[in-house]
Amino acid sequence: MAAKGARMIIHLECTECKNRNYTTEKNKKNDPDRLELKKYCKFCRRHTIHRETK
């Protein structure tokens, strides 16, 4: 049987309002650190930093 893939589903949480706005996948072998992206938050109505949560 084939091994389970290295990709895992993560959630991105706004650092200002703490809402989980985005869901994405990441390869834990290529990116072992926590993902941090600047994305639009519809609750804050502006671009904020979103950090990875599980």
UniProtKB/Swiss-Prot annotation:
Keywords per UniProt: Ribonucleoprotein, Ribosomal protein
One function term, GO molecular function aspect: structural constituent of ribosome
Any GO BP annotation: translation
Cellular component terms (Gene Ontology): cytoplasm; ribonucleoprotein complex; ribosome
Signal peptide (UniProt feature, chain positions): none
InterPro entries, per database record: Ribosomal_bL33, Ribosomal_bL33_CS, Ribosomal_bL33_sf, Ribosomal_zn-bd
Origin superkingdom: Bacteria
Similarity-based family: Belongs to the bacterial ribosomal protein bL33 family.
PANTHER family in UniProt: 50S RIBOSOMAL PROTEIN L33, CHLOROPLASTIC, LARGE RIBOSOMAL SUBUNIT PROTEIN BL33C
Protein name in the entry: Large ribosomal subunit protein bL33
Organism (species): Caldicellulosiruptor bescii (strain ATCC BAA-1888 / DSM 6725 / KCTC 15123 / Z-1320)
Gene behind the chain: rpmG
